[in-house]
Amino acid sequence: IFLLGPPGVAKSMVARRLKLMFRGGTAFEYLMSRFSTPDEIFGPVSIARLKNEDTYERMTEGYLPTATVVFLDEIWKAGPAIQNALLTVINEKIFRNGQFSVRVPMKGLIAASNELPASGQGLEALYDRFLVRKLVGGIEDLSDFDRMISTADESEPEMDEHLAVSDEEYRQWQEQMKSVGLHYSVLEVIHSLKDKLEDYNRQLENADSPSDVALYVSDRRWKKIVRLLRASAFLQGNTEVRLSDCLLMVHCLWNETSQIDWVRDAVLTAVGESVRGYVLNLSGIETDLQALKKEL
């Protein structure tokens, strides 16, 4: 998940609360800077192992490779060495520690920044890995704002252990999600969105002075989107992805903030078209059934 917003809007609190969902969960937080090193994220190199065993290995306990939920602030300031290691962790859930590949227990990675990644800096691959992008701002509702400023700072909240998700439950859910079906109307929505994206980019190419950048969605991203839709359906107790789940794509398809309104309209239009088509199809089936009854 990538959170885009100014400082002081409780972005890091999301990660700290999220870890409570998992039994025995731990969180790792870090504020990136241009001078951040891999040691600060993945753990320092063990001098003893390097000296006595001639082995390059990090002491990872308490750092990203051992955390359940990770929060990285100012993510785009990470250097190339950190970026490359993060790509492997996100893609494969594996951290290469010296000559060993270690499976990480990470269930969620939340990154934040008050800006989007600069173009031409080699950050495109890392940005593409963050499936959900969300704008985060200050509290707008005045009653909520008043309650926030007048309430004493709370200690770390607690969750009943019986409600927390165990590693075994999480593994089982991951397997069960794979069996969630895709209704043909959901595939129609995805096809429609792909067509709309092509039209959007084509219009930009033909514009005399394009004011926006092309909206590219990789095949890998589409596959992850479908996985998200399946997760949404599963957690609602459904055996099939529904059109309402498709609304999540509003937060998955934009790359620039200037594209958010277009993406929202495109998703709502595609879902609406599919709903109308589905209803008309049912109406046609009902007419055929009535005609068949008369013949019988």
Where is each model-derived feature located?
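Walker A/P-loop
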Residues: 2-34
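Conserved RecA-like P-loop NTPase ATPase core
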Residues: 3, 12, 41, 73, ...
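Active-site phosphate-binding and catalytic loops of NTP-dependent enzymes
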Residues: 3-4, 25-28, 51-54, 94-98, ...
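Short loop/turn elements that form and flank the Walker-type P-loop nucleotide-binding site
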Residues: 9, 23-24, 64-66, 103-106
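Short glycine-rich substrate-engagement loop in P-loop NTPases that contacts/grips substrate
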Residues: 33-65
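Canonical AAA+ ATPase core
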Residues: 48-53, 69-82, 88-165, 173-174
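Conserved C-terminal "switch" segment of AAA+ ATPases
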Residues: 134-209, 238-239
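C-terminal engagement/docking regions of AAA+ P-loop ATPases
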Residues: 203-223, 231-296
